[in-house]
Swiss-Prot record:
Cofactor needs: Mg(2+); Mn(2+)
Annotated EC: 6.3.2.-
UniProt family annotation: Belongs to the RimK family.
Name listed for the protein in its UniProt record: Probable alpha-L-glutamate ligase
Binding site for Mg(2+) 1: D254, E266
Annotated binding of ATP, by residue: K147, D184, F185, D193, R217, A218, N219
Residue ranges that the Swiss-Prot or TrEMBL entry lists as coiled coil: none
Residue ranges of every copy of the ATP-grasp domain listed in the record: 111-293
């Protein structure tokens, strides 16, 4: 089969692992930058055409693919999801589908979807730009977490120790036209969370992440430490439910333990493979390609 991966950085561990695994399974895989696409809607069939601009040379019409794996970063979400939508319109299976991918990339909309599915999440508020910052901050506890809507890898997440600081940060971001969420800080978790890697209807791998001393974020890209963990049945169930609530085939679901019980922090539609594979010792890439093969076959 001929597969396509949408990714700006083909040398990343996850991209290299998936390409190698796909090729070992007898498939061909192209890795293309979504920002180098031109999308065309035309009268004659096929109505959806895609052109690609290589680093050198002239643009060319892309062939049809058997399936596509989106691995683009947050800065490419708009164009990446447009490319995905174009491919989906040609009935090409996407792992994940464009609507679910876009939903997961928006922290507020994804939290709304989780809450609508009766999945517990931290207390969170999202205020319009004309809503008074002080009144918004009063609706959550202090210390307060502030998050931009589209950050990743811990970027765009701020901890305000005092309410006054939260107000000041919120006002500054609002003035810069940067939408921000306010969220309860789960201090009892001790800067630790659980990353669950979900494929289909099961958790295939998991790890516990802990932030460095003095760091409230547990993300690996912020220097977090990982270790193996055995999940309870409840943790597995919540992780799968969270992925399904967003309509994702593949997801990285982040869980955190609070005084009120287990909460879902967020759901990642393009979770990294490097730390989860190295920590758990599980070959996640092979399971992703196997799942994609079944999806293509309609199983």
């Amino acid at each position: 089969m001929k597969l396509l991966m949408l990714c700006r950085e083909p040398n990343l561990y996850s991209c290299r692992r998936l390409k190698m695994t796909a090729e070992n399974a007898g498939h061909k895989m192209d890795i293309l930058d979504p920002n180098r696409f031109l999308l065309k809607i035309q009268e004659n069939r096929p109505h959806f055409a895609l052109y690609y601009q290589p680093n050198q040379g002239t643009p060319y019409l892309l062939p049809d693919y058997d399936a596509v794996i989106p691995r683009f970063g947050t800065q490419s979400t708009k164009m990446g999801c447009s490319v995905l939508t174009h491919l989906a319109a040609k009935n090409i299976p996407c792992l994940n589908n464009p609507a679910s991918f876009a939903l997961a990339r928006d922290k507020w909309l994804s939290l709304q979807a989780l809450a609508a599915a009766n999945i517990a999440v931290p207390v969170t508020v999202f205020a319009g730009q004309d809503f008074q910052a002080g009144s918004a901050v009063e609706k959550v506890s202090s210390p307060t977490i502030l998050k931009t809507l589209n950050g990743s890898q811990g970027i765009g997440v701020i901890l305000a120790d005092r309410s006054q600081s939260a107000v000041s940060i919120m006002e500054t971001l609002t003035l810069s036209h940067i939408p921000v969420l306010l969220q309860d800080f789960i201090g009892e978790a001790g800067a630790s969370d659980i990353r669950c890697f979900v494929i289909g209807d099961k958790v295939v791998a998991a790890m516990q992440r802990s932030g460095q001393k003095g760091e409230f974020r547990a993300n690996c890209h912020r220097g977090g430490i990982t270790q193996q963990i055995t999940l309870s049945d409840d943790e597995k169930l919540i992780a799968v439910r969270a992925a399904q609530a967003l309509g994702l085939d593949v997801a990285g679901v982040d869980l955190i333990q609070s005084k009120k019980g287990l909460l879902v922090l967020e759901v990642n539609a393009s979770p990294g493979l490097e730390m989860i594979e190295k920590t758990s010792g599980i070959d996640v890439a092979t399971q992703m390609i196997a799942y994609l093969e079944k999806k293509i076959a309609g199983l």
